[in-house]
Amino acid sequence: MKKITIATRGSKLAFWQANYIKDQLQKMYSYLEVDLMVIKTKGDHILDVPLAKVGGKGLFVKEIEEALLSGEADCAVHSMKDVPMELPFELCLAAITEREDPTDMFLSIKYSGVKSLPENALVGTSSLRRQAQLLALRPDLQIIPLRGNIDTRLRKLMAEEFDAIIMATAGIKRLGLIAPYMSSLPCSVMLPAVGQGALGIEVQKERQDVLELFSFLNHKETYHCIQAERDFLAGLDGGCQVPIAGYATICKQETICLEGLVAKSDGSVMIRNRLERSVSDAYDIGMTLSKILLAEGADDILASMHTIL
């Protein structure tokens, strides 16, 4: 195989991610020609509606997957937090890259952190997961929907439309963006989204030539952790329309630790728990933890959220 086409979204961050994979491929295979195919997804077109109200899964991947299925592209680069639980039957994940910082970042031009924000401060985010955890910490905060690419969000902050905004740390680091006050929120305060910080390479199952190309990029520990998180999410049948968080780490030798959270969007109820299992049980730990949270009351929260939506 001498040439490969990578499908990607067109945002600056998505383009950075696709170019990163392109560079890794060309370092490993100097003979390989790599082209990028930019595709606009439904999620890119709808910028005036919070994600929780758009509905549907795969908002940022469906059109890209169609390019894979038609053969227009050989592979696709995704942020793993955007990848739906169920992939089309013909597609699979060829690799999950080593995870970047999975946390969320607080950014402000006046205030050093969440606790220093004034009463009733305006905080920008369209993530119900972030909203719920912020309000659990500071019920007085006014959460304002904030969509658009990273540059747009940062520009709105610098124009003082918000007292602070919350974004994924990985994206900020990858693009080298700065604000007067920036601080990563610890997982004890803001548990990350499932898959946050990792990149996934999606390909057709039958394309053995493409699968083999990406084997060197698969990071074993990250792969196990992301699979456990996604299994947890699948057990809850959740998506970006529900305040769910899940984060797994290899906490000891051959031991995987998974922490999960389901919350009411107003932060008034937070159900959180964790499990440890041997890495060999990574595919079992997610479903087990989801059942524990459902038994602890997450089922009522999820039912009420689906009724609202």
Curated annotation (Swiss-Prot):
Modified residues (S-(dipyrrolylmethanemethyl)cysteine): C240
Additional note from the record: The porphobilinogen subunits are added to the dipyrromethane group.
InterPro entries per record: HemC, Porphobilin_deaminase_cofac_BS, Porphobilin_deaminase_N, Porphobilinogen_deaminase_C, Porphobilinogen_deaminase_C_sf
Keyword set includes Transcription: no
Source organism of this protein record: Lawsonia intracellularis (strain PHE/MN1-00)
NCBIfam families: hemC
Transferase found in the keyword field: yes
Cofactor(s) recorded in Swiss-Prot or TrEMBL: dipyrromethane
HAMAP family to which the protein is assigned, alphabetical: Porphobil_deam
Swiss-Prot/TrEMBL catalytic activity: 4 porphobilinogen + H2O = hydroxymethylbilane + 4 NH4(+)
Family the entry assigns: Belongs to the HMBS family.
Pathway(s) this gene product operates in, as recorded in its UniProt entry: Porphyrin-containing compound metabolism; protoporphyrin-IX biosynthesis; coproporphyrinogen-III from 5-aminolevulinate: step 2/4
Any Pfam family the entry gives: Porphobil_deamC
This protein's UniProt keywords: Porphyrin biosynthesis, Transferase
EC id: 2.5.1.61
UniProt GO cellular component terms: cytoplasm
Cofactor annotation remark: Binds 1 dipyrromethane group covalently.
Role of this protein: Tetrapolymerization of the monopyrrole PBG into the hydroxymethylbilane pre-uroporphyrinogen in several discrete steps.
Record protein name field: Porphobilinogen deaminase
GO MF, one example: hydroxymethylbilane synthase activity
Complexes and interactors: Monomer.
